[in-house]
A protein has these predicted regions:
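Cytochrome P450 heme-thiolate "Cys pocket" and heme-binding signature region
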Residues: 261, 320, 333-398
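Conserved cytochrome P450 K-helix/beta-meander segment immediately N-terminal to the heme-binding cysteine loop
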Residues: 48, 309-337, 359
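Cytochrome P450
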Residues: 37-38, 47-48, 56-98, 113, ...
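Cytochrome P450 heme-thiolate monooxygenase catalytic core
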Residues: 88-227
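Cytochrome P450 catalytic-core helices
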Residues: 222-249, 357-377
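N-terminal membrane-proximal hinge/A-helix region immediately C-terminal to the signal-anchor transmembrane segment
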Residues: 1-60, 345
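Conserved cytochrome P450 K-helix E-x-x-R motif and the immediately C-terminal K′/meander segment
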Residues: 2-16, 255-297
């Protein structure tokens, strides 16, 4: 595994230790690796149970407690809004936005990693925060792009870059504050996005906590979706047999049915997306602080200890997956002998009840990208068999360039 600060292949070393020590071991003196599927599920679920937002800044300054708001309430508001957005019309709008962004770069020799980040971010931004002016949208996008570059860059950023990052982050935060305040005062229309439910909760949350909530969802669309999309293109160009299978299915599917329920309308494509996420789900490692005592037999995790989780390592675990390093979407066929041992073994979006709220719309976005690749565009990449994947905060295909043209 390569990271900006860790050039050694330490992820491989952790995987080797996990296989030898049954998935639970001290990675170093301060962090316990919890890579056994059931243990990871239990630790994640228990620590989420009473997870609350921090107190408002004004209340901390006055040394008093804020009204308690649990993250489960925030998740519930997001899920309700996402359910409203789960229609053929909204799915179609998401796919149409991706199409317009890709059309801007037709015929160019492009960095496909950066293109997919741009496509994923710009197409998903209206889902998170819509109704922005062009200037506001540019500020928010620049903030998210700079956060991403800090993660994927192979070299640490310098002082000047850090100062620019802070300034852009502050200006983006001011945009979010202005949008929420103007919606609350009736000076800006309400929107069907993931920020809007918190306009009504402003008296309880306070502006600083509302900003944190909206920033959380903006950050979530500013890296992982584009990383997953780049990984999808990586496997797409490396497997011409699956290109043919997807093209055959998506060329025959009813467009309205696909936009309504893509996972039902295109099961082969859905399996392809699931296998991409199994092999390359971002981020690779999650660091968490523990709040409850756990006894794992050979060791304990005490309150205040730090622990690591990794969907990537669970998805590559030979104890629960057969031939885990082989790309084979048909492992997700019902009854496939090389499929997941049980539901706890496939966690590309994390563990319930903290599973990523954007799992469904993220899947729609990736399947929509497959549909565009197979019905509208032709992607050309030289020597796809020579492509390699760098493992940084997330998987990043190296030297991944190509051209998109209309079919």
């Amino acid at each position: 595994m390569t990271t900006p600060q860790h050039p050694e292949d330490f992820l491989h070393a952790i995987r080797t230790r996990s296989a030898a020590e049954d998935g639970i071991f001290w990675v170093d003196d301060t962090r316990l690796g919890v890579f056994e599927p059931e243990a990871a599920r239990r630790v994640s679920a228990t620590n989420w149970r009473r997870f609350v937002l921090p107190d408002r800044l004004i209340d901390m300054l006055r040394r008093r407690r804020s009204p308690e708001v649990r993250w489960s309430q925030i998740r519930s508001a997001w899920l309700t809004q996402l359910h409203t957005l789960a229609t053929a019309e909204h799915h179609g709008s998401l796919i149409d936005r991706m199409e317009r962004i890709i059309d801007e770069r037709l015929g160019e020799d492009v960095d496909l990693v950066m293109l997919t980040q741009d496509v994923a971010l710009r197409s998903m931004l209206p889902v998170a925060l819509s109704g922005l002016t062009s200037g506001e949208s540019e500020l928010v996008r620049r903030d998210l792009e700079m956060k991403l570059l800090r993660l994927v860059s192979p070299e640490p950023a310098g002082t000047w870059h850090h100062l620019r990052f802070v300034v852009v982050q502050l200006r983006s935060g001011l945009v979010v504050r202005r949008v929420l305040r103007q919606r609350a005062h009736g000076k800006r229309g309400r929107e069907l996005d993931l920020a809007d439910p918190f306009v009504d909760l402003l008296p309880q949350l306070g502006m600083d906590r509302a900003l944190d909530v909206v920033t959380t969802v903006l950050t979530a669309i500013g890296g992982p979706p584009g990383t997953a999309a780049a990984s999808l293109l990586y496997e797409f160009v490396r497997h011409p047999d699956w290109q043919r299978r997807l093209t055959e299915e998506l060329g025959a599917v009813d467009p309205v049915e696909f936009r309504t329920t893509p996972t039902h309308a295109a099961p082969v494509t859905h399996r392809f997306v699931k296998e991409v996420l199994r092999l390359w789900s971002p981020p690779l490692l999650l660091v968490r602080r523990n709040d409850f005592p756990f006894d794992f037999g050979k060791t304990r995790l005490e309150p205040g200890d730090w622990y690591l989780l990794s969907p990537h390592l669970i998805h590559r675990d030979e104890r629960v997956w057969k031939r885990p390093d082989v790309f084979d979407p048909d492992r997700f066929l019902p009854g496939a002998p090389h499929g997941p041992a049980d539901r706890t073994c496939y966690v590309p979006f994390g563990w319930a009840p903290k599973k990523c709220v954007g799992a469904n719309i993220g899947t729609v976005q990736l399947m929509g990208l497959c549909h565009l690749l197979c019905t509208r565009y032709r992607l050309t990449v030289e020597h796809p068999e020579k492509l390699t994947m760098a493992l940084r905060f997330a998987p990043v295909p190296e030297g991944f360039r190509g051209r998109l043209a209309l079919r």
